[in-house]
């Protein structure tokens, strides 16, 4: 989404006097302290309570399940937009507060069970080889990923507003590929022990900015380079091993477009079995993004159904690949009841076709949640989304 359209458990052994303890006590009741300083009994991992498990979110074995099965269990989603995707080291630069656990708790309490975290890496990555990412930035991202895991959510992390250096054009493609491969190698290594509830999304709306075809499917050369970017990134992720050998990965078309030529020319890297298709559909944009037209007539509904049918036909039926509609939504300038009706219809019809929806919330014109006081500015829309997904 273009923002300008809208706005350890550290092991802290307690010292104690050995002479006060019997050998049997030492063998059977060794203890460690939690972060609050209280003593808890050591247990095998499989015996940890839900409360104790939350201290090591994400750690676990990646299941060997299909991407269709994963998408089916994920549940309707919410975007943490205009936060980590800010094109600045200051992640409050676009007006949203630093993400708190209470914020993600509130999203889960509303009924959302998938958290997409859009991330812009450029300001926190060295521009020259080996393209090192600031380790503090990775740690900050991990903090929010863990908030999602602590809420038993699936979490998606991506490469978002990095089009300034990811350029699908001949003069830039080699450096773009090298830097993107390095980025995903570092990210995959950092999150290697996280289970399959963490999903990697290679690119967000990849395109050449400013060209005539920017939002209409792109050009043949650019679409080909995007395929190359995906393959390089998937190869980099898989090469890190561990859970990343089975990590589910999302790839997308030119600009995440549903234009037929963009979908037709997207190729699956290595015919990898754990690839999910990511698309964005603010349909129709004149209503969803501009509030220039009304929505709700039978012809409006038929047109939206045709859009969703086109996506299902291309990917689920013809190419046997699951789809996540990673961004959709409506701006607040539209009449509230129209937005509620649209959300209900959109999510219900998408779900009926096996398409998972993740609503765009930027904290601005597309906002649902007020991130400052954690109240829902548009609770009726959020409620409609959750209800329609069930």
Predicted regions and their residues:
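Active-site region of glycoside hydrolase catalytic domains
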Residues: 178-293, 300, 306-331, 352-355
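N-terminal carbohydrate-binding accessory modules
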Residues: 43-114
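C-terminal motif of bacterial Sec signal peptides marking the signal peptidase cleavage site
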Residues: 28-31
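Acidic/histidine-rich helix-loop elements
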Residues: 80-99, 127-133, 172, 286-304
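N-terminal secretory signal peptides that target proteins for export/translocation
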Residues: 1-14
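An active-site-proximal structural segment forming one wall of the substrate-binding cleft
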Residues: 97-98, 104-113, 132-159, 169-202, ...
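Bacterial signal peptide processing site
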Residues: 33-35
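Substrate-binding cleft of secreted/luminal carbohydrate-active enzymes
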Residues: 305-377
């Amino acid at each position: 989404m273009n923002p300008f359209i809208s706005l350890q458990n550290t092991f802290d052994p307690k010292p104690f006097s050995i002479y006060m303890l019997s050998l049997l006590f030492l063998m059977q009741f060794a203890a460690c302290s939690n972060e609050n300083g209280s003593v808890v009994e050591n247990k095998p991992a499989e015996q940890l309570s839900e409360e104790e498990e939350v201290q090591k979110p994400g750690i676990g074995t990646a299941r060997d399940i299909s991407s269709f099965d994963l998408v089916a269990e994920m549940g309707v989603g919410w975007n943490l937009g205009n936060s980590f995707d800010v094109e600045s080291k200051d992640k409050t630069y676009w007006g949203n507060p630093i993400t708190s656990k209470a914020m993600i708790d509130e999203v889960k309490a509303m009924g959302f069970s998938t958290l997409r975290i859009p991330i812009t890496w450029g300001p926190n990555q060295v521009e020259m080889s080996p393209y090192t990412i600031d380790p503090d930035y990775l740690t900050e991202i991990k903090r929010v990923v863990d908030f999602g895991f602590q809420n038993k959510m699936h979490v998606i992390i991506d490469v978002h507003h990095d089009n300034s250096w990811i350029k699908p054009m001949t003069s830039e493609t080699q450096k773009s590929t090298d830097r993107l491969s390095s980025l995903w190698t570092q990210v995959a290594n950092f999150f290697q022990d996280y289970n399959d509830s963490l999903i990697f999304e290679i690119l967000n709306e990849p395109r050449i900015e400013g060209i005539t075809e920017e939002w209409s499917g792109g050009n043949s050369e650019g679409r080909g380079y995007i395929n190359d970017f995906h393959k390089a990134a998937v190869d980099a992720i898989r090469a890190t091993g561990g859970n990343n050998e089975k990590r589910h990965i999302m790839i997308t078309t030119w600009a995440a477009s549903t234009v037929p030529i963009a979908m037709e020319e997207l190729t699956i890297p290595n015919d990898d079995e754990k690839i999910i298709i990511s698309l964005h559909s603010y349909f129709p944009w004149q209503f969803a993004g501009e509030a220039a037209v009304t929505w709700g007539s039978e012809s409006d509904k038929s047109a939206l159904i045709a859009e969703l049918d086109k996506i299902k036909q291309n990917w689920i039926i013809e190419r046997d690949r699951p789809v996540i509609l990673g961004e959709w939504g409506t701006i607040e300038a539209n009449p509230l009841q129209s937005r509620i009706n649209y959300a209900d219809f959109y999510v219900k019809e998408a779900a009926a076709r096996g398409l998972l929806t993740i609503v765009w919330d930027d904290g601005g014109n597309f906002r649902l949640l007020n991130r400052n006081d954690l109240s829902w500015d548009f609770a009726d829309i959020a409620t409609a989304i959750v209800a329609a997904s069930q």
